[in-house]
């Protein structure tokens, strides 16, 4: 069975990628088309665009996550597949209104992290895999809720 490490850019998933080799390492990036959030380094912006196969203007995550992922790829010595869904700006527009994520509607995780990961899996592998997702110990209830939603 093939293994996939889902990497968020955080410490837990970076630890998993560095210490638990997998057939694939995948990073789902939350993008924005807001020019006010433009990533400052033009060369890196182009490199990320090339990795995603989509124009990368900026991210709503900390800019350091981009450098962390590029460094992690070198550290583990294995390619990290970068995936992305619709930009945040498009997702929050629903029925002509802005719809922001909140405690009960955590669509950022499902639509901007998990869905692009599942889309990548279907295109690249499309068979049963062992998927490793890094949740911290204090996120157990969140992990259980996420698992329940993905099994629906």
Residue locations for each model-derived region?
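ATP-dependent adenylation/nucleotidyltransferase module used to activate substrates
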Residues: 1-152
């Amino acid at each position: 069975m093939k293994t996939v490490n889902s990497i968020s850019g955080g410490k837990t998933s970076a630890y998993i990628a560095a210490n638990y080799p997998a057939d694939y390492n995948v990073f789902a990036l939350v993008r924005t088309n807001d020019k006010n959030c433009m990533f400052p380094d033009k060369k890196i912006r182009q490199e990320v665009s090339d990795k995603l196969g989509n124009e990368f203007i900026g991210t709503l995550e900390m800019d350091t996550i981009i450098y962390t992922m590029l460094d992690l790829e070198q550290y583990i010595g294995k390619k990290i597949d970068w995936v992305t869904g619709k930009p945040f700006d498009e997702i929050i527009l629903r029925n002509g209104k802005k719809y922001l994520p909140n405690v009960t509607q955590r669509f950022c995780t499902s639509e901007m992290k998990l869905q692009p990961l599942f889309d990548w899996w279907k295109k690249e592998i499309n068979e049963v895999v062992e998927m490793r997702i890094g949740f911290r110990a204090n996120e157990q209830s969140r992990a259980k809720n996420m698992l329940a939603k993905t099994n629906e």
